[in-house]
Amino acid sequence: MSDNTLVSDYGMCEEEQMARIAWFYYHDGLTQSEISERLGLTRLKVSRLLEKGHQSGIIRVQINSRFEGCLEYENALRNHFALQNIRVLPALPDADIGLRLGIGAAHMLMESLRPQQLLAVGFGEATMTTLKHLSGFISAQQIRLVTLSGGVGPYMTGIGQLDAACSVSIMPAPLRASSQEIACTLRNENSVRDVMLTAQAADAAIVGIGAINQKDQASILKSGYITQGEQLMIGRKGAVGDILGYFFDAHGEIIPGIKIHNELIGLKLNSLSTIPTVIGVAGGEQKAEAIIAAMRGNYINALVTDQKTAGKIIQLIEK
């Protein structure tokens, strides 16, 4: 098997580069110079891959590639939700979807972050997996990290994998306080407020998207931040998903009257709008409705997901 095949299904192997270049060139009518800027390749590389694609049979009248469906989904979702960036990972039976999403998100960040820029990170399994696969890049490019919410435990599976010399600002407070009054006091502490202001000034952010229909598999429930009773009550109020512990309905509107919202310590969802790029990482067909709501609410402007989930999203928005 060639090195190009081994690069992985999550990053940009040569076949995927050919497929993307062909799509942009023949379907979207972009020039080779525009494609080179979009993909971070030289114009000569774009030209050579177009030629190689023709010679190998990948590029014909149609794009003869396993990535074609992913590109079509990407194009449809980018246009429908006005996304800055999107990566749909090809279907791979029996693969660990969380691992694949984390690697895909790491590649997206490596393509967009510049040396010494600031990355804000939300809690959750997908974001922590991303950090694990981004650790070498973070060290080499001196990327600074800041957490978007309180709590040390939820972040340690990812941050604990980083080099000790990495610059990481962790909010010195729990993710959820025991009361609204205590949460208010903690938010006003200088040390907490400073980290929150730093997070708002980030160059990019990465967040997971929870779905209410995950039930006992929801990260926020498994981590002990809400009870099963609270989850049921929140679902009855019309919630379909959450980001950073804030629950929203199918239109992306924050659900009012939710106790946890007053007890969370960290950035509120509307504060994410100050960050130029906010990447949502989520997969699994049960999360499709929550992902749609997150995009409708404009909480994220970039997405990493898998082919089956993207297909489900398109099916739902076309109803």
From Swiss-Prot:
Its main location: cytoplasm. Keywords: Cytoplasm, DNA-binding, Repressor, Transcription, Transcription regulation. Inactivated by phosphorylated autoinducer-2 (phospho-AI-2). Phospho-AI-2 acts by binding to LsrR, which is then unable to bind to the promoter regions, allowing the transcription of the target genes. Coiled coil: none annotated. It is found in: Cytoplasm. One of its GO terms (molecular function) is DNA binding. Transcriptional regulator that represses the expression of the lsr operon in the absence of the quorum-sensing signaling molecule autoinducer 2 (AI-2). It also represses the expression of the lsrRK operon. Acts by binding to the intergenic region between the lsr operon and lsrR. In the presence of phosphorylated autoinducer-2 (phospho-AI-2), LsrR is inactivated, leading to the transcription of the genes. Belongs to the SorC transcriptional regulatory family. This is Transcriptional regulator LsrR. It comes from Salmonella choleraesuis (strain SC-B67).
